Amino acid sequence: MTVTIVGSQLGDEGKGGIVDLYGDDVDVVARYQGGDNAGHTVVHEGEEYKLSLVPSGAIRGKVGVLGNGCVVNPRTLFDEIDTLQERGLDPDVRIAERAHVILPFHRVLDGIEEELKSETDDEVGTTGRGIGPTYEDKAGRRGVRVGDLLDPDVLRERLEYVVPQKRAVVEDVYDLDVDELDDPDAFDVDAIFEEFREFGRRFEAEDMTVNAGAFLSATIDEGQNVMLEGAQGTIIDIDHGNYPYVTSSNPTAGGAATGTGLSPGVVGDGEVIGIVKAYLTRVGSGPLPTELGGVVGDTPGYDEQGEGENEELANYIREEGGEYGTVTGRPRRVGWLDLPMLRHSTRVSGFTGIAINHLDVLAGLDEVKVGHTYTLDGEELASMPATTEQWAKCEANFRSFDGWPEVDWADAAEEGYDALPENAKAYVEYIESELDTPAYAIGVGPGRGETIVREQPF
């Protein structure tokens, strides 16, 4: 069977920890979209592992698959694999031959485009890792796929077609001299060919490439369990998110089918677990109706740190929750939980269960609020509007909950749900009721043993 893990908010919900939590019953963990822009942290046997491309389950000795919906930077991939091996692990990672490859010029173009957007306050908040430009080339039918790295003739043909186009973009559209860039070799066919053909040789030598759909289907047919791991979150989905402040792929459950080669029926017959942070965070620009305080350069109209409402509360949550980007180190914007957002995410992906993380971060507050509904042009909305411009005009209608005290969270995790403070349980049960979806797990700390497990999906 399959279990699909979907971020229900704006990313950084703690998906990797839930993948790890249920990992003992899994044979294969497959990522179905994104690239090395999606950082996740896994704590295993007291050791912390920060990954951006290797699937979380590989830390526990499971087979990790990067599906065809992913974009793969072989530099990052092999750096992570080599680092894990140096720490005594031996990750088994397979790469879909249909997955597209992030090439050096993608990263350069990503940086140029974001810098130009920043001059007009239209920046999306990209990590600069070439994800968007790679997906653009995929849609434009000029990309290079992992399977191409295995065939030198095909690889050279692809590069000789696309690289001159990219040089022309830099020189004729952006009016820059390629030779004066920090990495002029990023636009050199021979340099790219030599480096990426070597990556192809390593893929072959280590038998890493697969036909992902066929591989995963055979795994399921053998009675094994497959976990499908999404990156980022629903609200930055290219179709269902707050466009244009989105990623370039589909983190929602629908992307699990297209990004692995499994049928929608197979994915739909399994469990779909939405991962919910007990409050809200965001990296980058765009609306955030329940925001507390702000971050200069990200929060619209926010020009001086410390000027926003509830700044002290925002800093408290940010520090208690360690709310800084895994990949970029950028401070995350923080806000109260947003129920219209979660209702939207639940509908889009059809969650059969949710996992609520970071409940402990809110402990010690006198009052905890939730954005229960929005008001837009005098009308109350229970779910997000379709356009970002409408969302930016929404005002949150809050519901208040009495806070809960700090407790020994490790003991609470061991004893189970009934050991939670009563007010914390009221908060959890409100979320379950509003989404009509049970909480399968409740995270009360960063470690695997600091999660209350109420339901095993496998």
UniProtKB/Swiss-Prot annotation:
Reaction(s) this enzyme catalyzes, per UniProt: IMP + L-aspartate + GTP = N(6)-(1,2-dicarboxyethyl)-AMP + GDP + phosphate + 2 H(+)
PROSITE patterns: ADENYLOSUCCIN_SYN_1, ADENYLOSUCCIN_SYN_2
UniProt organism field: Haloarcula marismortui (strain ATCC 43049 / DSM 3752 / JCM 8966 / VKM B-1809)
Function, as annotated: Plays an important role in the de novo pathway of purine nucleotide biosynthesis. Catalyzes the first committed step in the biosynthesis of AMP from IMP.
Enzyme class: ligase
Binding site for GTP: 11-17, 39-41, 332, 358-360, 443-445
GO BP terms: 'de novo' AMP biosynthetic process; IMP metabolic process
Assembly and oligomerization: Homodimer.
Active site: D12, H40
GO MF, any single term: adenylosuccinate synthase activity
Residues holding Mg(2+): D12, G39
Protein name, per record: Adenylosuccinate synthetase
Record-listed E.C. numbers: 6.3.4.4
One GO cellular component, as annotated: cytoplasm
Cofactor: Mg(2+)
InterPro entries: Adenylosuccin_syn_GTP-bd, Adenylosuccin_syn_Lys_AS, Adenylosuccinate_synth_dom1, Adenylosuccinate_synth_dom2, Adenylosuccinate_synth_dom3, Adenylosuccinate_synthetase, P-loop_NTPase
Cofactor, how bound (note): Binds 1 Mg(2+) ion per subunit.
UniProtKB keywords: Cytoplasm, GTP-binding, Ligase, Magnesium, Metal-binding, Nucleotide-binding, Purine biosynthesis
Compartments, record wording: Cytoplasm
Binding site for IMP: D12, E13, G14, K15, N37, A38, G39, H40, T127, R141, Q232, T247, R330
Family affiliation: Belongs to the adenylosuccinate synthetase family.
List of residues binding substrate: T326, V327, T328, G329, R330, P331, R332
